[in-house]
Amino acid sequence: NRTKTLINAALHGWEYEVRAGFSIGGTSPIPLPAEIRSINSYNPSLAISLEGNMTKWIEPTKKWGIVTGIRLESRKMKTDATVKNYNMEIIASDGGRLKGNWTGKVSTNVNNSYLTLPVLAAYKINDRWHMKAGVYASYILEREFSGNVYDGYLREENPTGDKVSIEGDKSAKYDFSEELRHFQWGVQAGADWLAFKHLKVYADLTWGLNDIFKKDFTTISFAMYPIYLNIGFAYAF
């Protein structure tokens, strides 16, 4: 039966758990480029994650192990910034596109969903505390990187090109969603605390190491990386 199966797995060094949590963070260039003069507002939005994973302890004392699993997660944020000579491609009212250097305000909405495979090394400090670190690979399922520009002007093609003003109650949209990479990867590190016999509290930091945009996308002139802290609860079988 199910109980005997779990006991037998534990005797052979296997552990299983399911996790549910939320992520706080953002997608950002590191460091902030000179074009971004100030961050006026930031909203992490509600980003949920669900995960099933398994740990294989690889020596008799169960100090060291390997963890892998599958995680369904979202990475979100909303920001508003003031920029100068920021590369931009806006969508005009007639559906056409204007490309150039934007000076003014930029609002950004990031809302992406991923299927993620972590591969981590685990170290058991004691019966309650576990540390984990390793790498992850993510495949994007749903993608959005869009927003508006307002209270400023666009210099077409280059910083000295024709000036297109967007001021007052006017704004223009941009949408780079189709330019997001399908595959992303990075590093992950975190800790678990066993609060009760089967219930854990965990915190994991993930840091992307490749640009979220495709290699041939040049409108945004700097790389952007997803950096998120995931906090939640786990049930250990």
PLM region spans:
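Detector for outer-membrane/organellar transmembrane beta-barrel domains
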Residues: W57, G65, Y114-T160
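Repeated loop/turn-to-beta-strand initiation elements of outer-membrane beta-barrel proteins
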Residues: K62-I66, R128-M131, K197-A203
